[in-house]
Amino acid sequence: YFSYNDKVIKILEAEYLNTNHHFTAGTVISDKLEIACGSGILQVQKLQQESKKALNVEEFLRGTNILKATILK
């Protein structure tokens, strides 16, 4: 999970990509909500914002704009 705009968002489905990168862990590195990890990249596929229904990443991003280079915690 991560926090964004004071909301807790659960990652329900994701794929781990074992690839090298130079980003800080937690950085959003694409418009498709790919997140840099300590090593590798997490490609988010399904999420759920607190008190909301679960959505695939495309549906979620239509209603919530998380900009590239945002650092999630």
UniProtKB/Swiss-Prot annotation:
SUPFAM superfamilies: FMT C-terminal domain-like. It holds the Pfam family Formyl_trans_C. Keywords: Protein biosynthesis, Transferase. It catalyses: L-methionyl-tRNA(fMet) + (6R)-10-formyltetrahydrofolate = N-formyl-L-methionyl-tRNA(fMet) + (6S)-5,6,7,8-tetrahydrofolate + H(+). InterPro entries: Formyl_trans_C (IPR005793), Formyl_trans_C_sf (IPR037022), Formyl_transferase-like_C_sf (IPR011034), Met-tRNA-FMT_C (IPR044135). GO terms for molecular function: methionyl-tRNA formyltransferase activity. It comes from the Bacteria. Attaches a formyl group to the free amino group of methionyl-tRNA(fMet). The formyl group appears to play a dual role in the initiator identity of N-formylmethionyl-tRNA by promoting its recognition by IF2 and preventing the misappropriation of this tRNA by the elongation apparatus. Belongs to the Fmt family. This is Methionyl-tRNA formyltransferase. It comes from Rickettsia australis.
